[in-house]
Amino acid sequence: MNWITNYVRPKINSILRRREIPDNLWIKDPTSGEMVFHKDLEVNQYVIPNSGYHMRISAKNRLMHFFDDGIYTPLENPKVVIDPLKFRDEKRYIDRLKDYRSKLGVDDNILSAQGTIEGLPIVATVQDFAFMGGSLGMASGEAIIKAFDTAIANKCPLVLFSASGGARMQEGTLSLMQMPRTTVAIEMMKEAKLPYIVVLTNPTTGGVTASYAMLGDIHIAEPGAMIGFAGPRVIQQTIRETLPEGFQSSEYLLEHGMIDMVVSRLEMKATIARLLRLIMKCPPAVNPSNPSPTDSQPPLSKAEAA
């Protein structure tokens, strides 16, 4: 009886017990409601195969897919004074920073790296919206300036992926100062006659739009990205008029001449490499590398997903 109670019954219960399924195995498409397996989404660079909806992607994942074979050398971000204003809203700013750093494993929202795309050496800088909404503060400003300095020192182009809600209110004027400081870095880049390409991702707003995000030589946007200075509701309340449908979307801005092109994330690497070769008068790549480091798992097309 003890053998049945202590061994057989627990064994049967463990077999029959329903296995718990992790919450993140299936991702829901916000536009169509379609459920997509998370592995398929990772391979497809977080672009929904059927609808083409571009979900947010982490800075590390973006760089992995962007650089040749997923290989790059991260740049160490400069150290800055933490919470110089001793700011507090619902919680202390320094505690808010600690929470984000513990959750995401990064110091701030900027990740810069050196590597190659189709053999071309470049510096890439990515803003991660997951860290305090990609807000521009002293740390992110210093990191962006260092990326420009590195590109100039190595005589190579810089590609910046913007994703931000604007200036970081917890740092006040110190945050706003990063707008002219990054603008000066861009002028130094232009004086060095080096290309600076901006990729506007969802969302790019506020002080970031009013500074380095709109000062590139070429402006590319991902499909469906929200791009603007103030939000639609603020503008409507100010001008007392109804805004056009799709106002501040990347497609609307392209139609009205505010950006140069709208490019799918799946085609971004090849497009930027082609543009850089034209600008820098480099010969075309003989064997362009796969945009994904996993050559055995190419991005899913709409037909394959169906």
Swiss-Prot record:
Keywords (A to Z) from UniProt: ATP-binding, Cytoplasm, Fatty acid biosynthesis, Fatty acid metabolism, Lipid biosynthesis, Lipid metabolism, Nucleotide-binding, Transferase
Region (Disordered): 286-306
Biased composition (Polar residues): 287-299
Domain CoA carboxyltransferase N-terminal residue range list: 25-294
Pathway: Lipid metabolism; malonyl-CoA biosynthesis; malonyl-CoA from acetyl-CoA: step 1/1
Family: Belongs to the AccD/PCCB family.
Summary of the function given for this chain in its UniProt record: Component of the acetyl coenzyme A carboxylase (ACC) complex. Biotin carboxylase (BC) catalyzes the carboxylation of biotin on its carrier protein (BCCP) and then the CO(2) group is transferred by the transcarboxylase to acetyl-CoA to form malonyl-CoA.
Name of the protein described by the UniProt record: Acetyl-coenzyme A carboxylase carboxyl transferase subunit beta
Gene assigned in the entry: accD
